[in-house]
Amino acid sequence: DFKYGFQAAQTPWIISQDRQNSSAGYDILDTSRVSKLFKFHTLDAGDDEMKKIKISITDIKASTNDFDPYGTFSVEIRDARDSDNSPIVIERYSSVNLNPNSTQYISKVIGDQFLTWDDTVRRYIVKGNYPNASNYVRVEVERDVDRGVTDATLLPFGSYGPLRFQQWGYQSGSDAPANAWARGSTNICRPLI
């Protein structure tokens, strides 16, 4: 549709482990149970990089240190054509963490900088705090994680899936609740909840 220019490919948000001990009533969108941690963006716009690389989070380890509650994990940039049985690792960042004060903080190790065009000054502006060490991706860390105000024991556990349309259905006018979208209609279209 050509409404937008090239955009960098990005992963879904990588999310934390469930912080409650019960699976009853589990909802991935419940922020009291699961937190967004970070996601990756390709450095180049368009879909070329998206077809060449994939990202794996490996070596996830909870902290065993009483003085440092932050666990560690590794990030692997892999060839998109490889398999888990025979991985082809292009770049590897070992023992990174989510502690903004650490030298192994994921943003410091991989980098989070990107360019954006500023019409006022008519030039590109560098945004982000840490130069990119990766040749392929930059990381975007969720704001509360970057400020150090989230639970220090959080570790990457999964990711949100792609967006999808909300389900919907038809309801007869005689069955419609009082707050339906239209009144007096014999067929009312409303989202299913």
For each predicted feature, which ranges?
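Subunit-assembly interface segments of extracellular/virion macromolecular structures
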Residues: D1-I193
